Amino acid sequence: MALLQISEPGLSAAPHQRRLAAGIDLGTTNSLVATVRSGQAETLPDHEGRHLLPSVVHYQQQGHTVGYAARDNAAQDTANTISSVKRMMGRSLADIQARYPHLPYRFKASVNGLPMIDTAAGLLNPVRVSADILKALAARASESLSGELDGVVITVPAYFDDAQRQGTKDAARLAGLHVLRLLNEPTAAAIAYGLDSGKEGVIAVYDLGGGTFDISILRLSRGVFEVLATGGDSALGGDDFDHLLADYIREQAGIADRSDNRVQRELLDAAIAAKIALSDADTVRVNVAGWQGEITREQFNDLISALVKRTLLACRRALKDAGVDPQDVLEVVMVGGSTRVPLVRERVGEFFGRTPLTAIDPDKVVAIGAAIQADILVGNKPDSEMLLLDVIPLSLGLETMGGLVEKVIPRNTTIPVARAQDFTTFKDGQTAMSIHVMQGERELVQDCRSLARFALRGIPPLPAGGAHIRVTFQVDADGLLSVTAMEKSTGVEASIQVKPSYGLTDGEIASMIKDSMSFAEQDVKARMLAEQKVEAARVLESLTGALTADAALLSAAERQCIDDAAAHLSAVAQGDDVDAIEQAIKNVDKQTQEFAARRMDQSVRRALKGHSVDEV
């Protein structure tokens, strides 16, 4: 198998010259930066030896702090201390407030409905906050490496949509970083473990971080990483464990007032500390807001059991998509700090029937994989044999006549990818075509997600079916989609890059996939009906034009038979009987065969008129 070179053009390092690159795990709760030194990938610590950087920014009128210093201010200045900003990326203000009604921030909407956070430093959006975190990580890397970074690979959840991915790239650009690539977090973990273990076969990457959950099923073979399927939830993570435990402590302490932000932060801090302690101890003492009590691991397990079960349901769906049984999985890689929770490890082990891998620190493994990939992409390993194949989570396609969806790129297709299909005009003289880009697994437009619309104009006015429009879908390595439509005879074209303003709702992707299975039979029948109705409309449209042009070729009796057949077809096409519509179309075809032959003869005679036999 010939492998593609994935180094970017122009980035090959000169002999003996090493470029500085870093991998960044931009996490919901904590972030890390890593690099490759002396052939080994390692995360970079701060001056106090701490590798994790809390994804928290504290804003003041005269500046801001990032990380531990910012987190320490959270209880005293909650409104100006922004944490878990990753959850806000690519979402509308209404969406954020509906999902997280108890966030202690002062929100305002921008003109496009996106969130702005009112802080002492002014109105800030999630991209700006993320950029400040990235700047702190880049500064740590530059200081450790004694030079400016030539490029970075930043990891994102596999289920991040175009808006969320673009927001991440915008944040990096704002931070002054050159993004070599966005990399799915589970894929980064696979790189780290694949290089370390050298195993071949199917591996499951279970990634439960602070704010997101991802499950990826990968095949590793001879250094080739192929993602067979992905699943997960873009709004489920260890933060949810913390909030459930905080609410439980609130109930036990009898604290009814939710308006005191300081108490809110104290409760959350107590919950986080208790969760960490319960990973090693069976019981923990809690002292918060004047209340003292005891929480057991069993009580904590009861609180989070339903959430852990949700992750396993996503695992089951991903395995089904990949065509793999749990017993076929060689190893299960645990990623994310939340996988330290004993119940998580226990349930995952039971589900896959094997003890999960935790050899690499689950907090660091994603950053390490990103650093390895950055080292390759920046040109330090031009002869690397590693090829990375990501996939798109949902099918991409177009709306066609009758409200149908024509899939152009099926879900779980490896990226980057480009696919094209040819379409044609429906009406005589049609000079424009509306392109409606869809995402989803169902057969009808009403059951899929609309991504974008644009129009192709300047199509030559030809008979129906005469113009040929090639529509090309291209998904780049970051999962961003561009669609181009071109009329082949003239070369006129139009295109669009799909960047939805908001992200998918919780569970929307999983729900869309589940619905496609549940309604498969119903969808096929609906598609068959819609296709027959479109064909009926096409036949009637064509017949109307033919009768307008050449009705003189028919006798009164022949015209009556054709009109009756057309009227019958028009009537049955309003109903839902697929067979009746099909038979009515066949009847129109039968009644018009002689008419079609006469029109053909007439066209031939007109074409030959004035020409000699020799000329023919």
Curated annotation (Swiss-Prot):
Keyword flag Disulfide bond: no
GO MF annotation list: ATP binding; ATP hydrolysis activity; ATP-dependent protein folding chaperone; unfolded protein binding
List keywords of the entry alphabetically: ATP-binding, Chaperone, Nucleotide-binding
Task: Cite the InterPro entries for this sequence.
Answer: ATPase_NBD (IPR043129), Heat_shock_70_CS (IPR018181), HscA_NBD (IPR042039), HSP70_C_sf (IPR029048), HSP70_peptide-bd_sf (IPR029047), Hsp_70_fam (IPR013126), ISC_FeS_clus_asmbl_HscA (IPR010236)
Q: What cystine linkages occur within this chain?
A: none
Coiled-coil spans are: none
Superkingdom of this entry's organism? Answer: Bacteria
Q: Which GO terms describe its biological process?
A: iron-sulfur cluster assembly
Tell me the function of this protein.
Chaperone involved in the maturation of iron-sulfur cluster-containing proteins. Has a low intrinsic ATPase activity which is markedly stimulated by HscB. Involved in the maturation of IscU.
PANTHER family membership:
HEAT SHOCK PROTEIN 70KDA
Q: Which NCBIfam families match?
A: HscA, PRK05183.1
**What family is it from?**
Belongs to the heat shock protein 70 family.
Identify the HAMAP family for this entry.
Answer: HscA
Q: What is this protein called?
A: Chaperone protein HscA
Starting at the broadest rank, the lineage of the source organism is:
Bacteria, Pseudomonadati, Pseudomonadota, Gammaproteobacteria, Enterobacterales
